[in-house]
Amino acid sequence: MTQTHNYDFDYFVIGAGSGGVRSSRIAATLGAKVGIAEYKDIGGTCVNVGCVPKKIMAYAADYHGHFEDAKGYGWDVKAPRNLDWGTFITRKDAEIKRLNGIYDGLLEKAGVTYYSGHASLKDPHTIQIDNTVVTADKILIATGGTPRKDMIPGAEHTLTSDDIFHLKKQPEHILIIGGGYVAVEFAHIFHGMGSKVSLCYRGDLFLRGFDDDIRETLKEEMIKQGIDLHFNCDLAGVEKDKDTLLARMSSGKTVECDTILS
C-alpha cells in the first residue's frame, strides 16, 4: 500500500481491544504503515475487565467446593474460611499483565506503532494522542463501550462490571442487581469466595430465555447455598452510612451491604 498526501500512517486505529489489534495487524501484514492508540490496557474488555478476570475469579471461588467435596472421598481437608484477597488480586493481575504483553508483542512483530494515551480526532485525517499529533489516510474508531450506571439517587455508590475487578478488599456483603448470566455468575463467584451475596432482579425469575427447568433448579440450589434472592424488584436508591450502604428496593425492602454491583 502506498502512502498519499504524506500522512504519517496509511491506517490508524483508535482502540487496542481484540478488534482493533486484529485489524491493525492484518493491515500491517498487507503492507500498510499502521499506528494504534489505547488509553487503558491493551487487549480490550475480554482480557482486562471481562472473560479472563471473571474466569480467574470463578476458578478461585471453585476451590471452596472442592475442599468440601474432598471430605467425602476420605481426605481430611479443612476448608479455609477466609480468602487472602491480596494474594488473589496479585495472581489475577499477573495473568492479565502476561496477556497484555502478548498483545503488545503481536503488534510489535507485525510492525504496528503503538501509542499509549487518549486519542481524539482533530479533523478527518489528524489524531491527537495526549501531547502527540499524527496523521493518517484512513482511521478506524474501535473504542468499544463503557457501562452506564442507573439514574437513581446514590448511583455514585454503586459499581459497574468494570469496577468489580479492581476491588481493594473482598466484599463482606455484596448486592448484585440484575438477572442475566453475568449477574448470576458473579453471585456464585462471590458466594464461593466467602462473601454474603444478595441478588435483586426485576423479573419473576433470572436467566430469561434459558430453559425453565434449569432456571428453577438453579434458583432452588442458590437458596439452599444461602444466596439471598429478590425477584420482582429493582434498585430504587442508595444511601451511605459510614462503611454501610443502604440499598432501597422498589418493593419497599432495604438491604444493608458494603458493595453494590449494578
Regions found by a protein language model. Give the residues of each.
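Glycine-centered short loops/turns at secondary-structure junctions
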Residues: 31, 194-196, 226
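Conserved acidic residues
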Residues: 17, 118-120, 180, 233-237
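C-terminal structured domain segments across diverse proteins
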Residues: 235-262
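Rossmann-like NAD(P)H-binding beta-loop-alpha module
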Residues: 168-210
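Glycine-rich flavin
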Residues: 2-9, 25-32, 37-170, 203-207, ...
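N-terminal Rossmann-like FAD-binding beta1-loop-alpha1 element of flavoenzymes
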Residues: 9-36, 176, 182-192
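Glycine/Thr-rich phosphate-binding loops of Rossmann-like dinucleotide-binding domains
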Residues: 22, 149-150, 184-185, 190, ...
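Short hydrophobic core segments
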Residues: 11-14, 119, 134-144, 176-177, ...
